[in-house]
Amino acid sequence: LFTRPRRFGKTLNMSMLQRFFEATAKSNAYLFDGLKIAAYPEYMAYQGQYPVISISLKSMKQASYTDAFYMYKNLIAKEYEKHKIILESNQILESEKEIFRNIMEQRADQNVYLNSIRTLSDILEKYYEKNVIILIDEYDVPLENAYHEGFYDCLLYTSDAADD
């Protein structure tokens, strides 16, 4: 959790962490050429080695719970789309692939979305056989907006249901 004042570079730092750790088809190592970290092989050994879930909730400023949830579904579906390579894997059960597809295509029930980040993390961990790095930027925007728009209690109730 990065707690810093506005305009302090949190988003930039999270983007840098994503590019450093994320396992991608094309290596991001060149982005760190000439930087001090590149001089440390013990750190560079971690570069490009982990699955990363990266979501920004900055756009979660809707006037109603329904609209906010619709936007959340879109954000989550886009993140699933980034990881759709796992659908080709034999390591992932067909039932897990079906859940994955339903979320990616925005056909899942509301309750499925409440745990969708955890579900994606579990599936990615199984596929890559490595821990997953989860980066959530602007995490406070949905709650702050819900408070100002009058659906804060509804949002909290929904988040309590996700914990069950």
Locations of the language-model features?
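Conserved P-loop NTPase mechanochemical-coupling segment
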Residues: 67, 71, 77-114, 142-148
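Conserved small/polar residues in nucleotide/adenosyl-binding loops
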Residues: 157-164
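P-loop NTPase motor core
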Residues: 26-85
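Conserved lysine of the Walker
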Residues: 10
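The conserved Walker
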Residues: 6
